[in-house]
Amino acid sequence: AIFQKKIEFKKLGLIIIDEQHKFGVNQRKKLSDKGGKNCDVLLMTATPIPRTLTMTIYGDMDLSIIREKPKMRKPVKTYSKLENNIDDIIRFIKKEMNLGNQIFWVCPLIEESKKIDHQSAIKKYEYLKKIFPNQVSLLHGKTNIEEKEIILNKFLNKKFSILVSTTIIEVGIDFPNANVIIIENANKFGLSQLHQLRGRVGRGFKDSTCILMFKSNLSDNAKKRINILKNSNDGFIIS
């Protein structure tokens, strides 16, 4: 809302932009221009976009890297699995649930599409709740605000174990007890988005796991992206 031309500030002195990779360079410039020459800008992100790194190299930005994570946090272990190995994943989930852990299951679409061969969140929710009765809930972009808050509060209070969702959980979600995230059609996501989604787990002191699901016919670029995620938890390396 504050990017609009009609929005003016009396004396804008500091702009702090979190999740800066969500904004384009021009968007950030428009906002900083509202403050004039005396306005400072602080950008924060876990995964800088390549163009931002280029700006840093050329001296337009000072860079501070915080490599240390909060104490007790462990690196998220990342694995890749073919979609036809879903039975193995289900067995793994059962084991985690028996340990009292919670799971995110992310799908790229809300509903089935005749044009795109992706698993939908609704279809996966229906599938999982048959296997895990009363332990699965669904969240997506069409969920109204009140219902979303109810679902997230129930998940926080461990009223159910599996949250099936679209990428709506990519940012602003902090559930230390959730230590497993499964991402379907992982080859269709960019590195930055996959890294952000993976960051929804590993926020507690337990071992955490990210499983990237994909079909067998991957392109070379898709294989490369998945391998990068499997081999690194460092946002700067990934970018």
Task: Locate the predicted segments by residue.
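C-terminal or mid-to-C-terminal helical accessory/interaction module adjacent to the motor/catalytic core
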Residues: P108, S232-S239
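Inter-lobe coupling/hinge segments of SF2-like helicase ATPases
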Residues: A1-N227
